[in-house]
């Protein structure tokens, strides 16, 4: 079976003549099929050039006709233009056209009018479509590669049409273009459009959701001040772009490595037009690591462990609290329906393990993964981004707690304006901090110390100098000997904790303080 493709400029009289002859042949011949492509005068020339380049043809006028063997596949066979098709039809089928020039012109004018009307209708429909604009900043970074499929397949944002904006630096533009092509190749139905850019205001144009991947390669000890200034400058430019072009109800989720809390605080300070509760940082990486270790201990799926809380500075000192953690599906003495859960601390029933081996494994988890992979744990980061964004947009499982770094409004005596990781519950489009967590004195001291560190860290970010060069290195996690817990942050916490020693409690045994990847029992 042969299919003939006839393409032409809408106002071309010769296209009109060829089109009507092909219609006549199709009506008389069972295996003769016609497909038509009509382009406006503005569209025709670039479209024809691209078609010929793709197929290795040489043709410069309207119309162009080629033949495709649809039951065999392979490359189309170029027939040519008006005269070539007329000769082809006369030679093979004994048919020709006697259409006069005046009629050809009239039909061409009618074709042009109809084509323009169709284009206007398409444009009207396009304007009426209101996809969700999602931008990914630093999209050439590895975590984005794992997040994007979940964004466009409906897993995160459900059945929302998406206009995807990918941004990165000029040096990564070719990577962005490759990523754009690959996302197109996924053929997911909810992807309305996709664009790549190196311009931040363009990336944030009408954006409803933004994922900012903070994953800069650090230059090492000598470049600490330069790294700091680069980060702060970048976040100020991000804030400026959000103020200029983003939707006023945009949700901004920051993820990655480094001093995220302080950087998010700077971002909030410079986006006065955006509600500060609409900007947050991912805190679920450490939370998921703790859940995984607890699940392995209890021989359950890690999805069955919930309500692990990570307090504090996502990129620095954190307090990992499992005192309220619950486990579903545990094979214990008491069984119940899927909704039934038990206390993790009670089921582990081993404070020595919680205070020792658990903390050691949690301390080394990230390094162990990175050493095995020979690169950062991008899949873990992507999963944390995906679940956090999904919960924020759709709501989280009822009654469960999750960790999120947000701007404090005085929660748990953390000063207003400090970005801190708290336990939260998500509702559709919003979150709320859970404020009924019981705290002992040790925990209050630790959170107070972490708060002081965050205030100091933000000041270091904004005013880096040679005088505080060593402190800058610690903010970036650059140390001379990573096997030695030399962090001043950790020392400060331990000093303050020793001042208020108390009897061991299940709550204290089920918590951990972590400075980056250094973890000690509380």
UniProtKB/Swiss-Prot annotation:
Gene Ontology biological process terms from the UniProt entry: malate metabolic process; NADH metabolic process; oxaloacetate metabolic process; tricarboxylic acid cycle
Top-level EC class: oxidoreductase
InterPro entries assigned to the protein according to its UniProt record, in alphabetical order: Lactate/malate_DH_C (IPR022383), Lactate_DH/Glyco_Ohase_4_C (IPR015955), Malate_DH_type2 (IPR010945), NAD(P)-bd_dom_sf (IPR036291)
Domain of life: Eukaryota
Keywords: NAD, Oxidoreductase, Tricarboxylic acid cycle
Region (Disordered): 495-522
SUPFAM superfamilies: LDH C-terminal domain-like, NAD(P)-binding Rossmann-fold domains
GO molecular function: L-malate dehydrogenase (NAD+) activity
E.C. numbers: 1.1.1.-
Family in the record: Belongs to the LDH/MDH superfamily. MDH type 2 family.
Protein name: Putative malate dehydrogenase 1B
Organism: Branchiostoma floridae
